[in-house]
Amino acid sequence: MTNLPEHQSSPTEQSSAEVKKIPTMIEGFDDISHGGLPQGRTTLVSGTSGTGKTLFAVQFLYNGITIFNEPGIFVTFEESPQDIIKNALSFGWNLQSLIDQGKLFILDASPDPDGQEVAGDFDLSALIERIQYAIRKYKATRVSIDSVTAVFQQYDAASVVRREIFRLAFRLKQLGVTTIMTTERVDEYGPVARFGVEEFVSDNVVILRNVLEGERRRRTVEILKLRGTTHMKGEYPFTINNGINIFPLGAMRLTQRSSNVRVSSGVKTLDEMCGGGFFKDSIILATGATGTGKTLLVSKFLETGCQQGERALLFAYEESRAQLSRNASSWGIDFEELERRGLLRIICAYPESAGLEDHLQIIKSEIADFKPSRVAIDSLSALARGVSNNAFRQFVIGVTGFAKQEEITGFFTNTTDQFMGSNSITESHISTITDTILLLQYVEIRGEMSRAINVFKMRGSWHDKGIREYVITEKGAEIRDSFRNFEGIISGTPTRISVDEKTELARIAKGMQDLESE
C-alpha cells in the first residue's frame, strides 16, 4: 500500500468519516468553501478562457508548498513549463526556486510543437505512471492538472479520452492526493464543461467567470458543489493582483463591536443636529445634487480628525489632487500641509481605471497600510457608473463591512440626478447599509436659490428633524435656522404657510426670554 502523509487518511477511512478539507490559502476561498477543498479528492475548476483557471491551480500548489511545506506536482497539457514559471514570477512566485529545492515538479505533457500525428489508440497509461512516480518521489500531497480540455482537442475519440481521464482521476484518488483539474467551458452560464468532463470528475466543481456587466468585466467564483460537505452558495466577486483575491461578502458576520464614542463632523451645528456628533464606527452618507456641498462636509470631517492627531484617508473619484487641494484651500483647509505631516493620504483615480472589485481591493490595502481613523469616499455614485446595481451594492457592503471591522468612521458622498426635490435617497438602494444619512438639496425661496440640509436618518441616536439652511462661505460650511413657515421643501415644491401673528410673536418673545436667562 502507498505510504500516505500523516495528516491524510486513506480513501476507505475517509468514506466512513467526515470529509476533511485542506486549506487553499487563496484569499476568501476558504471562507466560501467552509475550510478549503476536500482532502484526497479531485476538484474540477471550470471557466472560459482568461478566467484564471491556471492561476488558481498554480496558487493552490504554491501556497501548499510555502505555507504548509506540502510538495506538489503540476501537470501541464497546454503551456510549456518555461511559460508557467515566467508567468508565476509576475505574481512574485519563484517556482524555479521551489523546483530546485525538490518541492515542486512540473510534468510537461504539452503538445508537440511540430504537430506530429498520433498513431494507434489513445492511452494515458504512460502518463499516469509518470505522475504516480513523481508523487511518490516528491512525496506530493497536492496535484494540479491544466487543462484536460487540451487533451480532448488533440484527439478525436472523445469517449476514449473521457475513459482515460477517468482512469487518471481514479488513480489520483487511490494515491490520496488532493487534485485540481482545470477545464474550459464555452459560455459563462452554459454547461459546466466541454466534452462532458464533469461526468467523471463530479465530486467537486468550482466555476470561474469573467462576465461583461454594463461597460466593465466582473470576475466571479461559484462553488457548484463539494460532495459530502457544506459550502456557501452563489457567485462571489474576485480580483487578480497578487494572486486570486475573493471577496466573501456572504461570509461577513455582524459581530463587530459598537461604540458609544462620538466624533465631530467638523461643523459645530451639524454635531448638535446629530446629538453630539457621529458615532465612531458609523458609516455616514451625504447625498444630494451636484454643488450642494457634499465635498465640503467631507473636507471638514477629515480636517477635524487630522487636527486631533488622527489619520484620515480620502478616495476621490471625480476630482484631481490639485483640484481638491485648491477647493479645500478656499475654505481655509490646507490638505497639502496635512499630507506633509503624514496625517492625511489622498488617493485619486478615475472610476473606469479598474473594476469595482479592484477598487475594493485597493481601498482595503490602503486602509491596512495607512491605518486611518477616518475614511472618506467622494463619491460612490461615480463608481456606480456602468455597473449593475447588484455589483455596486456588493461593493458598498464590502467597503462598509471592512470599515466597521476596523472600527473606522466612514463618510461617503452620493450625487443624485435630480436637481430639485428627491424621489429616493440613492438609485442603488444602498441607504439601508449606512448608519447616518445627510440629505442636501437646493430649494427656491422667494425667487432665490438656497441650499438645505437635513439629518434624514441616524441609527441609535436622537437627531434634529428640521430642514435647515446650509450656506457655503469663505470659512466653510455654515448651518442656519430651519426654513420656518415653509412646507414641501424635500419634495422640491416649497410652499409658504400662513402664520398666526399672535402665536409667532409669542414664540419670538419666548425665545428672547430664553436667551436673556442664559
From Swiss-Prot:
Cited InterPro entries: Circadian_clock_KaiC-rel (IPR051347), Circadian_KaiC_bact (IPR013503), KaiC (IPR030665), KaiC-like_dom (IPR014774), KaiC_C (IPR047222), KaiC_dom (IPR010624), KaiC_N (IPR047221), P-loop_NTPase (IPR027417)
Record HAMAP family: KaiC
SUPFAM superfamilies for this protein: P-loop containing nucleoside triphosphate hydrolases
Binding site for ATP 1: S49, G50, T51, G52, K53, T54, L55, S90, K225, L226, R227, T229, H231
Keyword ATP-binding (UniProt): yes
Assembly and oligomerization: Homohexamer resembling 2 stacked donuts rings with a central pore nearly blocked on one side; hexamerization is dependent on ATP-binding. Binds 2 ATP per monomer, at the subunit interface on each ring. The KaiABC complex composition changes during the circadian cycle to control KaiC phosphorylation. Complexes KaiC(6), KaiA(2-4):KaiC(6), KaiB(6):KaiC(6) and KaiC(6):KaiB(6):KaiA(12) are among the most important forms, many form cooperatively. Interacts with SasA, probably as 1 SasA trimer:1 KaiC homohexamer, has highest affinity for unphosphorylated SasA.
Domain KaiC: 1-247, 261-518
Similarity field: Belongs to the KaiC family.
Statement: the UniProt record of this protein carries the keyword Magnesium: yes
Consequence of changing D121A: No change in KaiB binding, slight decrease in SasA binding
Regulation of activity: The interaction with KaiA enhances its phosphorylation status, while the interaction with KaiB decreases it.
Reactions the enzyme catalyzes: L-seryl-[protein] + ATP = O-phospho-L-seryl-[protein] + ADP + H(+); L-threonyl-[protein] + ATP = O-phospho-L-threonyl-[protein] + ADP + H(+); ATP + H2O = ADP + phosphate + H(+)
Name this protein carries in UniProt: Circadian clock oscillator protein KaiC
Record text about domains: In the homohexamer the 2 domains (called CI and CII) self-associate to each form a 'donut' layer. The KaiC CI domain mediates interaction with KaiB, CikA and SasA. ATP hydrolysis by the CI domain causes a conformational change that allows KaiB binding. The 2 domains communicate to control ATPase activity.
Sequence positions that bind Mg(2+) 1: T54
Location of region: A-loop, interacts with KaiA: 488-497
